[in-house]
């Protein structure tokens, strides 16, 4: 369920946060919880703000999990949870969230596949990382291709270095 009146406020909060008024943006988002405490998009925005604009990872995780709980088919919180878990070196959990999100309707497949590849790269499973970078390349016709190619090259170099000595 999407609430148009709420989306106006979510956009306002985003603009405040982008303009380095993080406290004001978060305050607006928190106040909206009184109106719609079970709105997945709202919890996703709050989790996004805490994850990328504050050091409070616990709040980010809580709100992203609430977003998924309130709407399990909404893809963005899975992507943000993947990022959060990668930052926390919780790679197994990250892959689980990213795999679930990848299969949601309207998921940004390239972003999910790219993050899954990064997890495998960090776990030093370079073959799997390369496989996911390639899958991401197949899923795009856009600007991401160069970045994904760099990921493949980087994994090949790391694999060569790890196994040549």
Features from the language model and the residues they span:
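Residue-level recognition of tetratricopeptide repeat
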Residues: 14, 48-49, 83, 118, ...
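TPR alpha-solenoid repeat register
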Residues: 42, 77, 111-112, 145-148
């Amino acid at each position: 369920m999407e609430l148009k009146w709420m989306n106006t406020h979510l956009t306002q909060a985003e603009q405040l946060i982008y303009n380095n008024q993080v406290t004001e943006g978060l305050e607006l988002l928190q106040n909206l919880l009184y109106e719609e405490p079970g709105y997945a998009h709202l919890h996703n925005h709050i989790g996004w703000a805490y994850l990328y604009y504050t050091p409070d990872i616990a709040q980010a995780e809580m709100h992203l999990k609430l977003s998924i709980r309130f709407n399990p088919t909404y893809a963005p919180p899975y992507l943000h949870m993947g990022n959060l878990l990668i930052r926390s070196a919780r790679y197994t959990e990250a892959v689980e969230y990213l795999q679930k999100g990848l299969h949601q309707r309207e998921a940004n497949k390239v972003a999910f596949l790219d993050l899954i590849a990064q997890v495998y790269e960090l776990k030093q499973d370079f073959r799997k990382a390369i496989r996911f970078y390639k899958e991401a390349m197949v899923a795009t016709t856009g600007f991401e291709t160069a970045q994904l190619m760099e990921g493949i090259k980087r994994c090949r170099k790391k694999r060569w270095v790890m196994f040549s000595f």
